[in-house]
Amino acid sequence: MDIIQKISEDLSLKKKQVEAAVQLLDEGNTVPFIARYRKELTSGLNDEELRNLEEKLQYLRKLEERRESILHSIEEQGKLTEELKKEILAADTAVRLEDLYLPYKPKRRTRGMIAREKGLEELAKALLIPCANPEAEAEKYISPEKEVLTATDALNYAKDILAEDFSEDARLREWIRNKSLKDGFICSSLKEKEETPESKTYENYFSYDEKVQSIPGHRILALNRGGKEKILSVKLRFPEEEILHYIEEQVQVSKKGKCRPYLEEAIADSYKRLIAPSIETEIRNILTEKAEDGAILVFSDNLKQLLMQAPITGKVVLGWDPGFRTGCKIAVVDATGKVLDTTIIYPTPPKNQVKESMAKIHQLIQKHHVDIIALGNGTASRESEKVISDYLKEQKSSVKYVIVNEAGASVYSASKLATEEFPNFDVGERSSTSMARRLQDPLAELVKIDPKSIGVGQYQHDMNQSKLTEQLNKVVEDCVNKVGVDLNTASASLLSYISGISKTIAKNIVAFREENGAFKSRKELLKVAKLGPKAFEQSAGFLRIRGGKELLDMTSVHPESYSVAKEMLALAGIAENELLSGKGKEMGKILSSLPGGLKGVEQKLSVGEYTLKDIIEALAKPGRDPREDVPAPILREDVLELEDLKEGMVLQGTVRNVIDFGAFVDIGVHQDGLVHISALSKKFVKHPLDVVKLGDIVKVKVLSVDVARKKISLSMKDV
């Protein structure tokens, strides 16, 4: 198989693009590096396209390895014909390859094998020819020493051989699989006779069936979980009569005369005992894999939006980790994230020390000039919000508060990483510090947590964990490199996601910084232990230095392009220090007005179109953060209760999670409301991600409120 050609066709990319990308990947270049700094070679493939290409490349290379292994195995058995070899070489999917290999695959001792050992293969062939009198033919094979005592025994053994042969016919299996996928149903029922509190979750699936072809992924994952918990019985129902009729046609049973009953029995046995269970397992696996891929895609998109939330810079933040019995843990951090103060207060039940608690908060706000309170959304959050809101009203304070998603905070605060970062803090102090820092720079703080613990997925614990981890780590890597990091302030956790930087090198960078002080130039990276020329090439462009020796070090311009960037500045008549005052914004316009325009500049400086464009963009806004374009979180000063909601109310909210059937929106009542997929838009919506993404600020209308069950139904239509 021509892998390059196959990728080109499957992903609708030019062959040259694929060739270049594959070569770059094979040379050890990372996806973020290729996407950003090798656009000329790939004709501008972005990180998403490169990830898809990389995944396809890995799949096809594994397929080739498997193909070679299968050919070798069949050849060793002495059964590799030219026709079979041709079919194996032409197989373009793993399923097709395995179908062709099935008859030759080493397997445990089967009924068909036992029948062959007893010498009944010729009788099986005779039934297909067919013979005039199968019973008389069978008598020739009676052999007491082989335990074939009667003609009926012989015919039964012959049927076992035929059943196995039919089940291993690649063309039959392919047709049956496709037919079952197209016309099959997935059905579920309650396993136990009586309902239990645990089974209530799955009441929609107690008597349920849906076409395999159209069932959405989230239902497959729900059925899988119900089956795993032994609450649901889940089965597939296929068009059996049509399938049996098709096999009979292929075997040409109607022309077999007296052999017909035996062939029909062999076909029925083949399908029910061998083919159907095998195809059912395959289809369940196909559906699960597709559902998992869909769920991982949604999780990845949600994670990306969460990581790319707008940072709140230059603000002193008070982090508030709410609690009841153990109290509310407080930490104040300055604009750089440095911890200024910590305390613990008890404004919530059972102590209800509101007055004393808020006196402490008032003291901290005054002492450190706090701008914003970052309140975690966990246990006692609602009670804490009421206390904060009452305090702000009473004080007529300009301080605002924001509800911060604290998913994963408890995991982080008890982790080895948190212990290393804050050795003298207890778990509560670490958690409240994390609340504050999450608001200041979500990306820098969230990279410290296992992406699976961030809680923006669906059925995440029911899917392939290694695949999920791999995909989510790629998302984090792409986000971190898209934003870039400050080389002099970034944690080892953040640095470890930078292109070309391993966890060991990340720790070495921090150690070098602590020993030698701040980096003054990107070139100094080469002095870091284990950071060689290749790692420097891959990472340098994503690491920023503010106030260093080289002004270009604070931009996304790669050191390999510094000479070109400086020549461009000279052509535009702009001094490097003028970039800080915004003069770089004029560069594109100035260069375009030169004789020959930008094309002339490309030729004069021997630079590619993509690189030229990227340098112009980088110098227009040195140190620009792409997250600046994202809506800032909603700052609140008043509290809204669930009971305050009325049908028809129009509110502003933040999308907190996107799933297959809709989006959950935080409207400030400590219970996210659901905008069902049907209420997202007046137009048809294939998937919620086509309309909203996590972190979006949206207007919603209240459709209904169930206070007892804490359920809110919202709509984004007609608002």
Regions found by a protein language model. Name each.
Residues 96, 402, 408, 413-483, ...:
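Long, charge-rich intrinsically disordered scaffolds of nucleic-acid metabolism proteins
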Residues 49-52, 59, 63-319, 325-425, ...:
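Duplex nucleic acid-engaging cores and interfaces of nucleic-acid transaction enzymes
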Residues 30-31, 42, 46-145, 482-629, ...:
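Accessory alpha-helical DNA-binding modules that contact the DNA backbone or grooves
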Residues 178-186, 320-324, 379-380, 404-411, ...:
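A glycine-rich phosphate-binding loop feature that marks nucleotide/adenosyl-phosphate handling sites
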Residues 37-39, 128, 239, 322, ...:
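Short, ordered loop/turn segments at secondary-structure junctions
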Residues 282-300, 453-484, 602-647:
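Long, charged amphipathic helices and adjacent flexible linkers at domain junctions
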Residues 141-151, 208, 237, 244-271, ...:
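Low-complexity, acidic/Ser/Thr- and charged residue-rich accessory regions of DNA metabolism proteins
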